[in-house]
From Swiss-Prot:
Residue stretches in coiled coil: none
Active site: 167
GO MF, one annotated term: naringenin-chalcone synthase activity
Lineage, highest ranks first: Eukaryota, Viridiplantae, Streptophyta, Embryophyta, Tracheophyta
Entry-linked InterPro entries: Chalcone/stilbene_synt_C, Chalcone/stilbene_synt_N, Chalcone/stilbene_synthase_AS, Polyketide_synthase_type-III, Thiolase-like
Native source organism of the sequence: Petunia hybrida
Protein name per Swiss-Prot or TrEMBL: Chalcone synthase B
Enzyme Commission numbers on file: 2.3.1.74
Pathway it works in: Secondary metabolite biosynthesis; flavonoid biosynthesis
Origin: domain of life: Eukaryota
Keyword check for Transferase: yes
Catalytic activity: (E)-4-coumaroyl-CoA + 3 malonyl-CoA + 3 H(+) = 2',4,4',6'-tetrahydroxychalcone + 3 CO2 + 4 CoA
Entries under Pfam families matching the protein: Chal_sti_synt_C, Chal_sti_synt_N
Keywords, alphabetical: Acyltransferase, Flavonoid biosynthesis, Transferase
Family per record: Belongs to the thiolase-like superfamily. Chalcone/stilbene synthases family.
């Protein structure tokens, strides 16, 4: 088919001139939180499982190895008392989980979004696109539509709802938002990741150690970003530039890490091979992303690594020969919030830029120019996002 010059110029006129940039970041968590040291006692008490003495001790050891101090959660003891099937290991409880999360996930997303919009400082009427991600509360119309109403956005905002993605999806959201911002001149994309462990909270079972790992690891939280190209001088101040973004998965990786939505909630399967498998496959992703830039020293980058668990962080650090300061922000977020699934790496991104400003660094990326965001999850899917910092 022949393409006329005028037609081609028209297509290019619809594209932004510059690369996508993160213009603001906001985060939010539920008010209720649990202390990790005392959580084994709490968990076995609220699930009426105190008779499982040996299993409780095993859970205590698992919790102590997570390097988590506290986690925020929607599920309070009062809510669990009112909905006892949530405390069972196998009783059907999906309807109750849905009722809770369909309401709470958009509200949590709203809190983070309002913080991002406030930092951005521009009218919310100029938001053109919304990308919402959660593994919780699948519904139609979805959390994206509910958030538009909660924020009072235009009904004409272009929406994309991503359900059931998992821990890698923080990187996915940046990749999708980059494409939207760069291919739609003047676009301002609101990205929201809101997650809750309530979808998978279950009582313990001696036959299911994987469940104990999930109960020790996941927390609740939401992160929101405003992303756009060609920032308005004097009105918009970029935080990071999204230089490139790519996705891949490890062949046969789904046998190592998978989650399944069942009548008893979201079930979790994880093998001991997850940390070494991720660590072994990360460097090939880095080489593909940074070889064109002439970079092979991974310590020359600032790092946002999704903390799937402490063992993963340790093995990636060891395999790549990273200095102890490189994954400090990752460990801080894991310690203070637990694994927040898709929102987690965005919390770390926020931590990096705040720490850089607090410590008087030259740039928003620990004083360095280039960095990498790596997120991974079911599949084993890996997202690799190259970021450029901005001067502070």
């Amino acid at each position: 088919m022949k393409v006329e010059n005028g037609q081609l110029q028209g297509w290019w006129a619809q594209r932004a001139e510059g690369p996508a940039k993160i213009l603001a970041i906001g985060t939010a968590t539920p008010f209720h939180w649990v202390d990790q040291n005392s959580y084994p006692d709490y968990y076995f008490r609220v699930t009426n499982s105190q008779h499982l003495v040996d299993l409780k001790e095993k859970f205590r050891r698992i919790c102590s190895k997570t390097m988590i101090k506290k986690r925020h959660m929607f599920l309070t003891e009062e809510l669990l008392r009112k909905n006892p099937t949530l405390c069972s290991h196998n009783e059907p409880s999906l309807d109750i989980r849905q009722d809770i999360l369909v309401s709470e996930i958009p509200k949590l997303g709203k809190e983070a979004a309002l913080k991002a919009i406030g930092e951005w400082g521009q009218p919310k009427s100029t938001i053109t696109h919304l990308v919402f991600c959660t593994r919780s509360g699948v519904d139609m119309p979805g959390a994206d539509c509910q958030l538009v109403k909660l924020l009072g956005l235009s009904p004409s905002v272009q929406r994309l709802m991503m359900y059931q993605q998992g821990c890698f999806a923080g990187g996915t959201m940046l990749r999708l938002a980059k494409d939207l911002a760069e291919n739609n001149k003047g676009a301002r994309v609101l990205v929201v990741c809101a997650e809750s462990s309530a979808i998978g909270f279950r009582g313990p079972s001696e036959a299911n150690v994987d469940n104990l790992i999930a109960q020790a690891l996941f927390g609740d939280g939401a992160a929101a970003l405003i992303i756009g190209s060609d920032p308005k001088p004097g009105l918009e101040r970029p935080v990071f530039e999204i230089f490139s973004a790519a996705q891949t998965f490890v062949p046969n990786g789904d046998c190592h890490l998978a989650l399944h939505l069942r009548e008893m909630g979201l079930t979790f399967h994880c093998t001991k091979d997850v940390p070494p498998t991720i660590a072994k496959n990360v460097e090939s992703c880095l080489i593909k992303a940074f070889e064109p830039l002439g970079i092979s020293d991974w310590n020359s980058l600032f790092w946002i690594l999704h903390p799937g668990g402490n063992a993963i962080v340790d093995q990636v650090e060891s395999t790549l020969g990273l200095g102890p300061e490189k994954l400090r922000a990752t460990r801080n977020i894991l310690s203070e919030y637990g694994n927040l699934s898709s929102a987690c790496c965005l919390f770390i991104l926020d931590e990096i830029r705040k720490k850089s400003a607090r410590e008087g660094m030259r740039t928003s990326g620990d004083g360095l120019d280039l960095g990498v965001l790596l997120s991974f999850g079911p599949g084993l899917t890996i997202e690799t996002v190259v970021l450029r910092s901005v001067p502070i």
